[in-house]
């Protein structure tokens, strides 16, 4: 069966996951993480894609981003990947691919799902420089990061929003919700309710949810 084209919608937030091959860590230290973030800032501007959250883990990268056009997300990830892998290989005197195949992504339904995706990234690591958590929690702002409308709606003042986000960070993302989001990302589907999935399918001209297993029912 032919592989479906990537599901991506202009103007919608997406959760993105890019995994390392496992043979070596994706980030060895703070210098590597700084190099990745530098490449990310350059690609954001070049590809007109807003980044809302990031997490740089030893074996994977998590992003939440909104592309201005359907192809912007892929261009962003590919641009960052090329720049970073080149710098990584030079610095560590190694060669070859760093990533395990294609990146994975899911279109996010506006509303609570976008906030869950932010928490999926911000909550992945509390270490400075490992995620964008500080940007929303009263710490140093990361240049170029934009908060989505869902975050702005949490409170009327920056202090109120930051306090609410710190509380959410402390509670963490419900495990079942995190598993649901990751399944959508790994499958390349929509993370949303059935009605939003129907709209996404129509907009992208491809399925947005996995088909039921087994043969179609006879009519």
Label the predicted regions.
Residues 62:
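Conserved G/P- and acidic residue-centered "switch" motifs that form tight phosphate/ATP-binding loops
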Residues 1-57, 66-219:
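Short Pro-Cys-Gly-centered "Cys-loop" motif that presents a nucleophilic cysteine in a tight turn
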């Amino acid at each position: 069966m032919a592989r479906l084209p990537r599901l991506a919608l202009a103007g919608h937030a997406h959760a993105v996951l890019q995994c390392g091959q496992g043979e070596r860590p994706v980030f060895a230290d703070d210098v590597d993480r700084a190099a990745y973030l530098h490449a990310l800032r350059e690609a954001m501007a070049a590809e007109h894609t807003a980044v809302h959250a990031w997490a740089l883990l030893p074996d994977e990268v998590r992003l939440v981003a909104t592309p201005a056009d359907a192809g912007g997300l892929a261009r962003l990830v590919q641009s960052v990947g090329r720049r970073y892998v080149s710098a990584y290989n030079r610095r560590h005197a190694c060669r070859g691919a760093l990533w395990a195949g294609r990146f994975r992504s899911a279109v996010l339904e506006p509303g609570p799902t976008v906030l869950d995706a932010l928490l999926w990234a911000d909550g992945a690591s509390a270490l400075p420089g490992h995620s964008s958590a500080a940007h929303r929690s009263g710490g140093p702002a990361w240049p170029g990061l934009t908060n989505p409308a869902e975050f702005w709606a949490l409170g009327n003042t920056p202090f109120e929003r930051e306090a609410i986000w710190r509380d959410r960070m402390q509670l963490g993302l419900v495990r079942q919700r995190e598993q649901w989001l990751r399944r959508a990302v790994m499958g390349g589907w929509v993370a949303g309710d059935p009605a939003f999935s129907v709209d996404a399918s129509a907009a992208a001209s491809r399925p947005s949810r996995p088909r039921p297993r087994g043969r179609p029912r006879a009519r």
